[in-house]
Structures are given as C-alpha cells and as structure tokens.
Curated annotation (Swiss-Prot):
It is an enzyme of class 4 (lyase). It catalyses: L-aspartate + H(+) = beta-alanine + CO2. HAMAP family: PanD. This is Aspartate 1-decarboxylase. Its main location: cytoplasm. Catalyzes the pyruvoyl-dependent decarboxylation of aspartate to produce beta-alanine. It comes from Caldicellulosiruptor bescii (strain ATCC BAA-1888 / DSM 6725 / KCTC 15123 / Z-1320) (Anaerocellum thermophilum). The gene is panD. GO terms for molecular function: aspartate 1-decarboxylase activity. Disulfide bonds: none annotated. The keyword Cytoplasm applies. Belongs to the PanD family. Its cofactor is pyruvate. The modification Pyruvic acid (Ser) is found at residue 25.
Length: 128
C-alpha cells in the first residue's frame, strides 16, 4: 500500500509575475527549487492565500537567486502580482517509508529569499 504525503513546500512565496501568453506552468527561482527539493517539470499544487484558489501545474526552472515566482498560461488568471502563495509537491511512499519521511519546508520573505528551512510544521504556527 502507498500513501501520498507532502514532499516539499515553499511557504508564502510572493507572485512576481503573471504571464497569460505562455504555454503554462509556474516558473520558480532555481535556488528555491533546490532548497525545497522540487524538480523541473514536477507537478505541484499551488494555493493562493489571497483568494483561496487551488490548482495544479508543473514547474519551470527560473533564474537562480532572482526570487522569480511567475504563473504562466491559464494559471496567470488565478493570481495577481503580489499575492502570497503556497507551492506544494507530494510523493507516494510505502508505509515503511512513511514512518521515516520528513517533508522539506522552505519559508521565504516578501522578496522570496529563504529565511528558514524546516522538516515540520507546528499546529497554529503563524508565519505572517
């Protein structure tokens, strides 16, 4: 049996661009991708904190250190520049793997610079 769990998360990233006339996807700063363990072309779920939208897309690698978080194609209609979003990737684990699994959580500031890395979240933890 397999269980789908959170693999990694970039928490409260700021949308820097929304490009409607692109094929599709989300462009993420390569530095953030590496810190979170998110790979190019990997499927991710995006949650918009500002408006509650939730959607899936795939990742394109952005310029390292740029802070770029750009929603492309149809997803560009679901965000505004400046919105705060959560980007999550999931993985399938066996029950044996599950008990040793720790997600990679990347907390960023308003410029999408890494401020903290973690492998857990506490209930009611507020990162504002």
């Amino acid at each position: 049996m397999f269980i789908e769990v959170l693999k990694s998360k970039i928490h409260r990233a700021t949308v820097t661009e929304a490009n409607l006339n692109y094929v599709g996807s989300i462009t993420i700063d390569e530095e953030l991708m590496k810190a979170a363990g998110i790979y190019e072309n990997e499927k991710v779920q995006v949650v918009n904190i500002n408006n509650g939208e939730r959607f899936e897309t795939y990742v394109i690698k952005g310029e390292k250190g740029s802070g770029t978080i750009c929603l492309n194609g149809a997803a560009a209609r679901l965000v505004q520049v400046g919105d705060k979003i959560i980007i999550m990737a999931y993985c399938l684990l066996t029950m044996e793997e599950y008990y040793n699994h720790k997600p990679r959580i990347v907390f960023v500031d308003d410029e999408n610079k890494i401020v903290r890395l973690s492998d857990k979240e506490e209930h009611s933890e507020c990162i504002c």
